[in-house]
Amino acid sequence: TIGIENRYRYYDLPLPDEMGVLLGLNTDAKYGFQFDTGHAQALEALGLCEKGIWLRRFSDRLIGVHLHDVCGIQDHQLPGEGDIDFGSIARSLPENCQKTIEITPFATSAGITRCLEFLAMSGCIISF
């Protein structure tokens, strides 16, 4: 399976319209959208993407998600320690979606445990 990820910087491809073009090139189920929660939030915070546009437009092609939080525009924070509404994200994730927790290498064991508990409570992961 190949997933095309939304990117962190405004000058990186793809932005939402470009993602639509790329996903339109191949409709095979093994070619889809890899959603990065932090990248989306950072672009929203900068006013470059409207809130929730990525999942509204591409949830039907969603194959995976990178779960991390953002404080302002600083990404790769532990989920639950930033600005992202993970409950609303959880409602858009299909059951077969691959989930990756993508966090700073400076996270502590206790912080990671809190993060996993938070993601379970928000519905992003089944249990911890």
Predicted feature residues:
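Histidine-acidic metal/acid-base catalytic patches
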Residues: 13-128
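Aromatic-lined carbohydrate-recognition surfaces of secreted/lumenal glycan-active proteins
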Residues: 1-12, 34-35
